[in-house]
A protein has these predicted regions:
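Positively charged n-region of N-terminal signal peptides that target proteins for export
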Residues: 1-7
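Short secondary-structure boundary micro-motifs
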Residues: 3, 32, 104-105, 259-261
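Aromatic (Trp/Tyr) and acidic
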Residues: 10
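Short loop/turn segments at secondary-structure transitions that flank enzyme active sites
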Residues: 14, 192, 290-293
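C-terminal motif of bacterial Sec signal peptides marking the signal peptidase cleavage site
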Residues: 17-20
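Long alpha-helical segments found as membrane-embedded helices
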Residues: 22-175, 283, 289-294, 301-386
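A glycine-centered loop/beta-turn motif at secondary-structure junctions
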Residues: 41, 203-339
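An acidic, glycine-rich "communication" segment
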Residues: 138-264, 376, 381-383
Length: 386
């Protein structure tokens, strides 16, 4: 299958050249290796690294720069950003990230190792910027019990004391689970957490004004959510919201929510849909739904059964593209402030959390994983992928 993918990548490159594509693809080795998309201009605005090593193509996901995130990648290169894919079998470390202004982690399905969390923290505190794009709770795409919000937060819901809870011996001892430790990571480093709520189809038009959003919301009227989550602000000196869902009722919850789905009745009490953070020399931005970024050009077949994926044109909806690009522009700029308290912006209140949102009190509401994978498929062993 990998050789077929390489041939398809070559064909795609030839088509781009014949069509006069606005990007020069300087290297394109497919899923297993590094992909670099360079703008034609020599005046590179910044360098952006995309993580693809944490299950970004699991299940129906295809969140890679030559697939379901290609519209995003193309928009970046048109704005003179150089865009690079980390590589399918790579781990995040400081040396890999340090030469990039922005690192994007799209809806990760495999957990970050403790060493990767440490590297992200070092990278940001040294002046780098991170963009994390999550999804609703129970979006486990490869049946490994981890949702993207759990991966990014740093712990599994209901398994804070044991990240391998419920796994068999082969899973728990696999390379994917080595050095995986529970940590309240986003809260400790960035002053926020992805909530484990699950909201349905929402038009998000309650936006922080341009001044209080560092220009991120300039010209933006609304962005969209199609089954997503919000973010809890735990330290207002570090983190603040820039886009908020409207007031909601129980009918606005995602149909497959494992609990009430909506925690604080929506509105600003629910926590922001999109948040930013200022940490030492660096920055972070966080989005509660991958639907806002995806496009309808998936590259790969499903890893569990080989079927064709279907993705959607979320990047083109509402003002999603404008908002996302302005997020990257803000992340690309350096600021000397150590946190938000000195940046002359309105600071948010802390989000009121439910008791079960404390990591040690969290619970697994339904049996996990939510489904049974095709016989022979093992999320932790790529040799079993279709």
């Amino acid at each position: 299958m990998r050789s077929k993918l390489s041939i398809l990548s070559l064909i795609t490159l030839i088509v781009f050249v014949i069509a006069g594509c606005s990007n020069d693809v300087t290297e394109k080795e497919g899923k297993e290796g590094k992909i670099v998309l360079s703008p034609k201009s020599d005046d590179i605005k910044g360098k952006v690294l995309f993580d693809s090593a944490h299950g970004q193509t699991a299940g129906s996901a295809d969140w890679v720069i030559n697939g379901g995130f290609s519209d995003f990648a193309d928009a970046l290169t048109k704005e003179n950003y150089e865009v690079t894919d980390l590589g399918y079998n790579q781990l995040l470390n400081y040396d890999k990230m340090k030469d990039y202004e922005v690192v994007v982690i799209p809806e990760a399905n495999n957990p970050l190792k403790a060493s990767e969390q440490d590297a992200i923290e070092q990278y940001v505190k040294s002046g780098g910027s991170i963009l994390m794009i999550s999804d609703h709770y129970n979006a486990d795409r490869n049946f490994n019990r981890y949702d993207s919000s759990e991966v990014m937060n740093g712990y599994r819901r209901g398994a804070f004391d044991n990240p391998t809870k419920g796994m068999n011996a082969e899973e728990s001892s696999s390379d994917k689970m080595k050095d995986v430790q529970s940590r309240d990571f986003l809260n400790e480093v960035f002053g926020l957490r992805f909530r484990y709520n699950a909201l349905g189809n929402i038009k998000v038009d309650d936006l922080a004004d341009e001044k209080d959003s560092f220009g991120i919301t300039k010209g933006v009227k609304a962005v969209s959510m199609h089954a997503g989550s919000t973010i809890a602000i735990t330290d207002p000196d570090k983190a603040k919201g820039v886009a908020f869902v409207p007031k909601l009722s129980k009918d606005d919850a995602w149909n497959h929510a494992v609990d009430q789905g909506i925690y604080n009745g929506g509105g600003r009490n629910e926590g922001p849909y999109i948040a930013v953070s200022k940490v030492s020399k660096g920055k972070g931005a966080f989005i509660g739904d991958s639907s806002m970024v995806e496009d309808k050009s998936p590259k790969y077949k499903r890893e569990d059964n080989g079927e064709t994926k279907k993705t959607y044109d979320g990047f083109k909806e509402e003002d999603n593209q404008k908002m996302i690009m302005q997020i990257v522009d803000w992340l690309n700029k350096k600021d000397d402030d150590q946190d938000l308290s000195t940046m002359n912006v309105h600071l948010d209140d802390k989000t009121n959390l439910l008791n079960f949102e404390q990591p040690e009190n969290s619970r697994e509401n339904e049996k996990e994983p939510w489904g049974t994978p095709k016989q022979g498929y093992k999320w932790y062993d790529s040799s079993t992928y279709a």
